[in-house]
């Protein structure tokens, strides 16, 4: 049913009775039904949307996209993450049930990308907010690379112990890194300097003869039935 081999599988008898552990059974059920929460903000998410088509068909991996973090066990971040978006991303991750996994897709998510060079509002790596299981570099990565990342995550799930996973997540809570989010007053007050607007030349600066000559030469628009 599944091509991934379990290291803790004991033996298979002649009567087709499989002797295994509860941990392996839990891992098998989870890796065969990953429900991702799609957190896409940029062009990388368009590449992930290509997986829905018949050419790649990500339904064969049991992937069912969910719109609620409470029903998802995998969050896939794609695109630039800004300081203003960081609390929302952390909140979504916190609302996901355990065990949960993260795939960082694209250069903008992993390092901040080209937007982190001179930007003061870009998070330079989503792993400063939430723990990442699989890094998927590229700008943007191809759909084949996304499938490879999902396959690697499935292999990782098949070999892990549930207790170790929970202990690791509690010990390495990378999303608790403090960011100095200072509340600033809004600068968009609706007031603007009207003096900088473009002012057309006054008609008093144009000679009267030239003004009326130009006015008469402009024909009024005709309605066409």
UniProtKB/Swiss-Prot annotation:
Tell where it localizes: Plastid, Chloroplast thylakoid membrane
Which EC numbers characterise this protein's activity in its record?
Answer: 7.1.1.-
Annotated membrane topology is: Peripheral membrane protein
Name any cofactors this protein relies on: [4Fe-4S] cluster
> InterPro entries in the record, alphabetically?
NADH_UbQ_OxRdtase-like_20kDa, NADH_UQ_OxRdtase_20Kd_su
Indicate which residues the UniProt annotation says bind [4Fe-4S] cluster.
Answer: 43-44, 108, 139
Q: What is the protein's known function?
A: NDH shuttles electrons from NAD(P)H:plastoquinone, via FMN and iron-sulfur (Fe-S) centers, to quinones in the photosynthetic chain and possibly in a chloroplast respiratory chain. The immediate electron acceptor for the enzyme in this species is believed to be plastoquinone. Couples the redox reaction to proton translocation, and thus conserves the redox energy in a proton gradient.
Classification via NCBIfam families: nuoB_fam, PRK06411.1
The name this protein carries in UniProt is: NAD(P)H-quinone oxidoreductase subunit K, chloroplastic
